[in-house]
Design a protein with these regions (language model features):
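N-terminal nicking endonuclease/strand-transfer module with a His-rich metal-binding environment
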Residues: 1-172
Length: 172
């Protein structure tokens, strides 16, 4: 009957709402704080075109909306551009999750590998837990000081009575 030793380590989980830089997250350009020798350790879960996601999510609703319009000036030709230029909505949102800091959870340590596993598990269930946040870009970075996860998503709602019946919304 072997005894098990239980070790309890306290760490903070930080969740930040970011501006979102898909090009940085997918490493289309490399920031100064990136260690290029560790980039191969990153996990790119998905990296879809946001415009393609908009077509998939909203084209049917856009057609229904436009078909009902009697005035040509009320029709929307490009829903993505309409939202991109809107003052009320953003085309997408980003959250960044990190456990601990560069001292307690360095990417190059055992604790960093633990953070990687925890963040990976968190991502694996994210879309199922959040069906109205359509993830189009998600990346786990192991090439910076601390492992962290970027999740970029388009929030949407269905069943709206005004405007498009399926539309961008973080509020609903």
């Amino acid at each position: 009957n072997a005894e098990k030793e239980v070790i309890c380590i306290r760490r903070t989980i930080s969740v930040m709402v970011g501006k979102g830089s898909v090009n940085h997250n997918s490493r289309k350009f490399k920031a100064e704080n990136v260690n290029g020798e560790r980039t191969h350790l990153n996990n790119d879960y998905c990296n879809e075109s946001i415009k393609k996601v908009y077509h998939t999510l909203f084209d049917d609703a856009l057609k229904r909306y436009n078909d009902k319009q009697t005035r040509a000036d009320r029709r929307i030709s490009n829903y993505y551009e309409k939202i991109r230029n809107s003052k009320q909505e953003k085309p997408f949102h980003e959250i960044i999750l990190q456990i601990g800091d560069m001292v307690t959870m360095s990417s190059e340590s055992e604790n960093g590998l633990l953070a990687q596993r925890i963040l990976d598990e968190y991502y694996q269930g994210f879309q199922e837990r959040n069906p109205y946040l359509k993830v189009f870009s998600a990346h786990l970075h192991m090439d910076e000081a601390t492992p962290h996860l970027h999740i970029d998503f388009v929030p949407f709602t269905t069943g709206s009575k005004r405007g498009l019946d399926t539309r961008v919304s973080l509020k609903q």
